[in-house]
Structure formats: C-alpha cells, structure tokens
Amino acid sequence: MPPPFPTATAAASTTSHLALLLLLSSSSVFFLYKSLRLRRNNPPSPPPGQGPAPTPTLLYASATGTSKALAAGLSRRLAEAGVTAHPADAAAFDPDDLPSLPLLLLVLPTHDGGAPPPAAAFLARWLEESAADFRAGAALLSGLRFAVFGVGSRAYGETFNAAARSFSRWLRALGAAEVVAVGEGDVDGGDLEVVFEEWCGRVVRVVKGEEIGEGHNGESDGFDELEEEESDDDDDEEEVDGGEVDMEDIAGKAPAARRRNGKVEGALSNGGENGVRDMVTPIIRTSLEKQGYKIIGSHSGVKICRWTKSQLRGRGGCYKHSFYGIESHRCMEATPSLACANKCVFCWRHHTNPVGKSWKWKMDDPLDIVNAAIDQHTKMVKQMKGVPGVKPERLAEGLSPRHCALSLVGEPIMYPEINVLIDELHRRHISTFLVTNAQFPDKIKTLKPITQLYVSVDAATKESLKAVDRPLFSDFWERFLDSLKSLHDKDQRTVYRLTLVKGWNAEEIDGYAKLLSLGQPDFIEIKGVTYCGSSATSKLTMENVPWHSDVKDFSEALALKSGGVYEVACEHAHSCCVLLAKVDKFKINGKWHTWIDYDRFHELVTSGKPFRSQDYMALTPSWAVYGAEEGGFDPDQSRYKKERRHGAAALKD
C-alpha cells in the first residue's frame, strides 16, 4: 500500500518534471514564434500545380517523319495543360543556348550503327565533346532539366535507341537533371503510341509541377555507365593486370585486358613493331578520342578549336586574331608529338597524353602527318555545314587552312623531323605558331624560322616551376633558363607565354621581370589559367583563376618593371589575355604593329635569305589595342554571350 503522503524523493522528482515541462513549453513557444516569423519572411513555394510552369524547348530530329509527328503530339498534350511548346528541328538549334534553358524535351530516332540522325549530329557532337572536355565543367548545364524519348526498333539489338541513351548520358554528365527516364519506343513492337503516351503523361505532370521528376544528374558517372553497357560478361573470361601499358598518370580507369584460352587479348597491344613502340596506346587513344581528338598515325593529333567554330559562325575569333591577325576559322590546331616532358598542374588534358624525356617511339613520316592533319581538319570543318550562323563563304575559306597552331598538346619539338614538317606547312602557305615547354634548348636552337615561336614561362623561380610544371628532367631549371636564352638569337618573332595561376605564380612579378633579359622576346602573352575541373592529377579550383582585371594589373606592373622596354599593346578580354610588346620594334609613330603580314612572311621564307620580325609586321587595328572599348573583340563579328557555370562562380566578362 503506497504511503498517504509523497516522500521527499517523490516530491523532488515531481519538481524536476514540472521544471522540465516548463522548459519544454518555453522552447516550444520560442520555436513556434521563430517558425511563424520565418514563414512571414520566406513564404513557402506554391504547392505542385500552382506555380508557373517552365517554358519547355521541344526539339525533334526526324529521319522519316515519325519523331516529328510524335513531337507534335507532345506539343498538343502540353497545350491542353496550358503550356506552350512549339516543336523545332534540332538541326536549327544552337547548343550554346542550352545553359540558359530551364527545360529541354527531345524526341529522336537512332540512325545507322546507333548514331544520332543527321539532323541532331551537330548537337550530339557538341554534347559529347563538352562532356569529355575538362574545361566545360560538370556544372555547365546544372540549371537544365530534360527528358528524352527515343524511336527505334528492337530488331537492331544493342543499338536499339542508343542515340537517346547517349543524349541522356551526355546531358547528365554536364550536370543537367533528367526529370523523366528515357522513353524507348519500338516502331516494330506495336506499342509505340502506348509507350509514348505514358512518357508524355509523365512529362506533362512534371512540367505542371504535379510530379517532382526523377532528378538524375551529373552526379552519376556517365562514362562508367557507358563502359558497363559495352562490357562483355562472358563467364570464361578473367581480368588480367593492365600494368604493362606504357604510360604515366593517365587520367581515368584503364580498361582491363581479357584472357581467353590462356592468351591476353585486346587493349594491351600498343601496335609496336620490331621492339619499337607506338606512342599512342589503345588506352591513350580512347581517352583522347573521347575529348574530340583525331589521332594521326602513331604519335600525332589534330582537333578543331572552339574559336574555329566560333569564327565560322561569325561570333568572334581567338586572341591570336586580335593580337596577330590570324583568321581563326582558317586555323588548324595540331601536334606531331602527343608526348610531353612536363605534367603541368593546369594541363587541359589532365595528363591523358604520354610523357617522356626523349623520342623512344616509332616515327611517322612528316609529309604523311601534314596530309592527314589537313584531311582530318577539313573533315571536321565540313561537319559545320548547316550549323546555325555558318555562312557558305566562311565555310569555303575554312576548308583551306592558312595557319597551324602547333600547340595542341604535348611537346612538338620532341618530334625528330619537326623542321621537315615546318617546311612542308610553309610550302603550302600555312603559317606556324609553335609552343615549346622550355625543356629542350638544343632543339630550339636548331629550329628553322617559325612564323611565331613561343616558350611557356610558367613560373619565375626554381621552386615554383617545379610545383607548377612538375617536369621530368632533374636539371629542369637549367634547361628552362637555357631555353629562354635560345630565343635571344632568333630573328623571327618570339614570345614568352605566361599562364597566371593565383596562389601558385601570380605573385612573382619581380622574378618574371628578371627573366626578360635572358630571352628578350618580342612579345609577352599573359593569360589567366583556364579552369578545367579538378582531378586526381590537378587540384586547381576556381579560386586559382584570376579575373581579367588581375591579369591587366599584373601586365601593367610587369611593363613598368621592364623600364620602358615593353608596353601593354593589346588585350582579348574574352580569353582573359593581355599582350606586351617591345616598344622599339613594334610601336611606330605611336601606333602598334603587332599584326602579321602573312603573305610577306611566306615570301621571305621562300627567298631563303635572312630576315627579321620587323620585316613582316603589320598595323594593329584600333579595336585590338589595349584600352579600346571593344576589349579586343572584332566589331565585324557578332558578339554572343554564353551563360557559364563552373560551380564556384562565373568569371567576369
């Protein structure tokens, strides 16, 4: 029987409970007050179906008319729901508009061999190359939602609706969110309309806000997914170690070789003959081809530059157009050596190319390289036919290249027959812009006249050069200094190319000023580093990317340090790039002459007589001069501004 009165212990317990209840009640009142206040300051989003529906961009790529008809049907379904979406041919769509779109709906068939139909070929190339391009960034399309419906036939087996799946994979790799899973219609299965109607229903509900959508985005690894789809799961195979492949720090996962009946097959062969290896192994080839390279022979490559595409469309040229007067739409970007002696932290390729300190590979004929490079380049230019903005006359000019940037990737002067290759380019009246990484001074000395010869000056001290370039040579600093000195004896145009990386080398202006006396170059190009994504081999972030104003400040300070020998001559704001030029050579009567008279250069080369850089200079147009309101943008071109997303912040214009 319990006691008639509470004990002291029970009384204390009751008091504690009352205090706890009072505390909880006070807290509840406080949090309720805060919640009500937050709701007043931040009203909740309207429930599904009440908010404004995004305006979709509805594209079709039709081969026989089926996809076009389906897109029209989707348009009607959306109209019934109060949403306007007019079907448009993908052939007339500009991929540069993708980052600014809220919602993309795409209906397309699969063409021969699993490829997209011709009407979507340019859009497909743009997406595929952007997805593989480290510079684009995984957040390029982070503001885009999308859904894709494919039209095909299961009779074609594994290529059934392959094009639709590829578009989905590329879009997700660029950060876009897939709100409805890929719809796969079978024209021979008898249920195309049923499958399409079901897919349309989900799209309409998502657009109206009645359904959240699946939300798959770039967090999934699209390329791994592709490899899984293409893998062969035969039970009688086993993986073998791929360590015999001759490469260093290759980005990405190497495909495993297969063993059948005790023999290794496939990916590990490097195509070498008589003990001499090919530079480009199958793994390296696959990695570079994903990035849009066309591999030539066993060690060379060519790739169409985005500025070539830009000027073909009348949207402006690269900084070389502003500084030196090249026609960007007639410029071929190539290299006779994909190998390099450095592993720079800002490498655009994330070290997907081979490395080496000397030539140890099979060597291709220089004339074959030039022929193949021009052939591959013109094929890529031809693919621009029909792209919005490309004019026939520009396309015709682009099919006849007049400039070659030997700066694609790797170290071009490692190629033993570089002089023969240069002679052949000049014989065809193709000017040469060669970039070397300042590790082969003897080869610089033996180079024949180049239209313009660059040396990369990535740091001003031994310690920072080692950190930035990560060179293979132990005597890298001595090689670097000797390379700069080798420029001093060149009569043709020479350039120091500086890439500024905040936190790495942008604070070394006094050291850079001291290096000027070694090579006494005609020009100094100063460019902010291009953000190309982080990886296991590069930890650069957007914090390391300087603003254009930072580059300008650095350039002006370096010009002052030169004591009047150099002045700031030109700028290309879009590329975050500034040019310093020697005053006594290129500033005549107060006007800059940084442009090149290309016809005169070829006359001088053909003559075989000695000549100087002043012998083929030309007047710089006013719009390219430093401080002009155009910022280095050619007023004859049409300015087109893209929306860019690099995760942290967008660069100032």
UniProtKB/Swiss-Prot annotation:
GO biological process, one term: wybutosine biosynthetic process
Residues annotated for FMN binding in this entry: 62-66, 148-180
Domain of life: Eukaryota
Necessary cofactors: [4Fe-4S] cluster
Catalytic activity: N(1)-methylguanosine(37) in tRNA(Phe) + pyruvate + S-adenosyl-L-methionine = 4-demethylwyosine(37) in tRNA(Phe) + 5'-deoxyadenosine + L-methionine + CO2 + H2O
PROSITE patterns per UniProt: FLAVODOXIN_LIKE, RADICAL_SAM
Cofactor note: Binds 1 [4Fe-4S] cluster. The cluster is coordinated with 3 cysteines and an exchangeable S-adenosyl-L-methionine.
EC number(s) given by UniProt: 4.1.3.44
Secretion signal, residue range per the UniProt entry: none
Enzyme class: lyase
UniProt domain Radical SAM core: residue ranges: 324-567
InterPro entries membership: Aldolase_TIM, Flavdoxin-like, Flavodoxin/NO_synth, Flavoprotein-like_sf, rSAM, tRNA_wybutosine-synth, tRNA_wybutosine-synthase
Sequence ranges assigned to domain Flavodoxin-like in this UniProt record: 56-204
Keyword annotations: 4Fe-4S, Iron, Iron-sulfur, Lyase, Metal-binding, Nucleotide-binding, S-adenosyl-L-methionine, tRNA processing
Single GO molecular function: FMN binding
Biased segments, Acidic residues type: 221-249
Protein name: S-adenosyl-L-methionine-dependent tRNA 4-demethylwyosine synthase
Taxon lineage: Eukaryota, Viridiplantae, Streptophyta, Embryophyta, Tracheophyta
Gene name tied to this protein: TYW1
